[in-house]
Amino acid sequence: MNISELSIRRPVLATVLTIIILLFGLIGYTTLGVREYPSVDNPIISVTCSYSGANADIIESQITEPLEQNINGIPGIRSLSSVSQQGQCRITVEFELSVDLETAANDVRDKVSRAQRYLPRDCDPPTVSKADADASPILMVAIQSNTRSLLELSEIADLTVKEQLQTISDVSSVSIWGEKRYSMRLWLDPTKMAGYGITPVDIKNAIDNENVELPSGSIEGNTMELTLRTMGQMHTATEFNNVVIKEVNGQVIRLSDIGYAELGAADIKSYMKMNGVPMVGVVVIPQPGANHIEIADAVYERMEQMKKDLPEDVSFSYGFDNTKFIRASIAEVESTVYEAFILVIIIIFLFLRDWRVTLIPCIVIPVSLIGAFFVMYVAGFSINVLTMLAVVLSVGLVVDDAIVMTENIYIRIERGMKPFDAGIEGAKEIFFAVISTTITLVAVFLPIVFMEGTSGRLFREFSFVVAGSVLISSFAALTFTPMLATKMLVHREKQSWFYRKTEPFFEGMNRIYSRSLNAFLKKRFIAIPVSIITLILIGVLWNVIPAEMAPLEDRSKITISTKAAEGASYEYIRDYTEDINALVDSIIPDAEAVTARVSSGSGNVQITLKDIKDRDYSQMEVAEKISKAIKSKTKARAFVQQQSSFGGRKSSMPVQYVLQATSIEKLEKILPEFLNKVYDNPTFQMADVDLKFSSPEVRVNINRDKAGTMGVNVRDVAETLQYGLSGQRMGYFYMNGKQYEILGQINRQQRNQPANIKSIYIRNDAGEMIQLDNLVEFVESIAPPKLYHYNRFISATISAGLAEGKTIGQGLEEMDKIASETLDETFRTALSGDSKDYRESSSSLMFAFILALVLIYLILAAQFESFKDPFIIMLTVPLAIAGALIFMYFGDITMNIFSQIGIIMLIGLVAKNGILIVEFANQKQEAGEDKMLAIRDAALQRLRPILMTSASTILGLIPLAFATGEGANQRIAMGTAVVGGMLISTFLTMYIVPAIYTYISTNRIKKE
């Protein structure tokens, strides 16, 4: 007794099992997190080390090199990169996805602690920090006011908004963008300081001595004890202005005599505006695996409650909300599920033409789909675009087994058998076929489990959900479906009106197919050249279709990055960014929000468009319009970026090409030629390199002999320049219970050119004032401000933006060509960022594709007990791939992860049709028919089931191929590949498989 017979004999058991699947599925659905994609960012550990006053060369040789040397041996490292700059080095260790973040952090800490003995004694201890894979904000609350300063807004954002939002469940952290922290600014006048004989070091010492509060003990009496507190701290600008710096001949010199103190912003070289109004942005970062939509809803609710706590002249709005796109794209996919469900029901009814027979397989669809949510829950997945796409795809798949089972039982009832007996007989005959097609389909998804990197992590969830749905559907088809068929199906003496009207069409279809198949089998040799042409077509189209990681989506968001030449001032890049902002306002006056951010050397303008349904233009059209317009703004460089579908590197350009050499001189020599070729290449819209040799600097060469004679040491010179010019922290003060920095610096107007440095004085060991000009020589020079390593080599990374219509695959091909023309064998090249992910996913998908073919072949060989028969079925695969590529080529669809997964799926889908024909033909042969007659009868008898299951799969995916709205391009890519492959392969399979069968199938009669 098999499971189908058990279910027919015990209908309550079959019903209970189905209800349990539904119940667990619903529980899983209600507890799953919601996000856009699975987490695909690699674990990243950062190591930073400061060495005050050291230039990039010293940092590289004395700090970066020893640290890298030790870290390099840790297992599981994907890439090791570093940047050495004035006073600091930062090493970024990226691990493989399979490595646990905590383990990686502990390994790095261990290696760093071992390396510390090789570092300079007076450098700061290195710090190791984890970069959370999900640490990108999902939502920003913009705090604005027309009357208050950014300092006041920052305080409101920090004390009111941030404190409230941090308490929301599943929020990892809340940051403030554009924050202006209070500081006590000490502005110094070098001329007055020279007149009074005061140096910047004197001011630092005075602050240290006058702004101090130490524990002062207590007074103890017989009955009482009093704690003593020395009120040595200063809290206001007035107190700082009155601080005594020095006393000369009874004359007290205060800070106000040689400068002034004011309460101001610690960071004066940054700003942030939204729609032209200065603002600070409070951004919310979720915990890994959290439900992003629930967090966003909680933020909206909390902000509404907070309205009464905010001052009347302070308003808030939302700068961006990434969950809008997530909501919309998942809602679009959900509606696609319903559309697919309805279309599948219609196609089944049109073929079976009986509502009872239609209803039975259709019940399997919700059981399988709801059950899939329990699979997601057990596996720790989330509801995201990929798992929902898997659900859409399953609509057409899960019904196949139930259709075959129901039809087989129905045929027996029509012949006059009792429903109970028909159920047992029909289920027994089809039992093996259901099991074998299920194993075949699930086997296609096994290779995806072995895929590494980004694509592997992305599609593991997808493949698990489809495989889970198919397994549940076959279980339902073998248990609930036969039980239901025995209860619902009845023998009809007279067919319905609709059946009688449509039967001539189906009989005519059978006759046409029979005649055309007979004609084709007479000239069956045509099948061989058709197969060869198909393979050639695949080779040509595979290379012609452009490739990329994922199609670009309309996310209603565009970013323009601005960058000035090395050495440009903050004001220069600020004015340029404001020019770009004004240009954007003129091009898209109806934008929802335009946010500009500027810091020293670079800036960006982020444009949030209206929702897709509220505008008649696309994000891509706007981006192209802006790209053309900003070419006229030549004071600095600007580059338009549109966010890629996945990966955390949302701010970098798509092409990241790393040149590695053994010395920096080699890179300096080759980079201009390489970059010129990139600039001249029409594939790239813009290019830049991180390693610069054009940063202007003034080198202060100290005459050591002269300084020694005058009683001045090098440290005195360095400290005088540091405290006078660098805005160095001179201590801390407290205000309203919070700690803020004291920053000292010479007035901007008196340090705006190198000649101003000459007016700074220094005190020698005899207490005499000596003008700095007497001890030093100023030499203007250029040097790399930062030195880069990538995987232990000295490196330069060329970042390039792609021209309209170009893909990352084409960009990397062009880079490889330029590299082969320009570089000799002493150079090495590598990829980073999105480029590395793309290359790895391409090779990973090819591995999955080949493994899927091998697995299917081996499983079929085991099922048919033949190595020849599976080869016949495998011939359907090239037909399907050719169909997919033809549709992709004419539909202007790129070769991306979504379309490639569609192609891998086709292997299992089209193999099912071949299995039905070959297995039935083998049964006919074993019954005594010769090969030709057996395959002709099998193909004719299996025509309707094949057309019905193929049509249900195709119609289930039609809503994907014609998708609109948010996230449509991904759905279109997958839908077009599968629909195209299924359409062409279904038609050709009905002729090619019978023809090839007659040539190479196992002769079953001889075996008898």
Question: Where are these predicted regions, by residue range?
Answer:
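Transmembrane alpha-helices and their membrane-interface boundaries in multi-pass membrane transporters
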Residues: 395-409, 431-450, 457-499, 605, ...
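Transmembrane helices with small-residue packing motifs
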Residues: 12, 19-55, 113-123, 377, ...
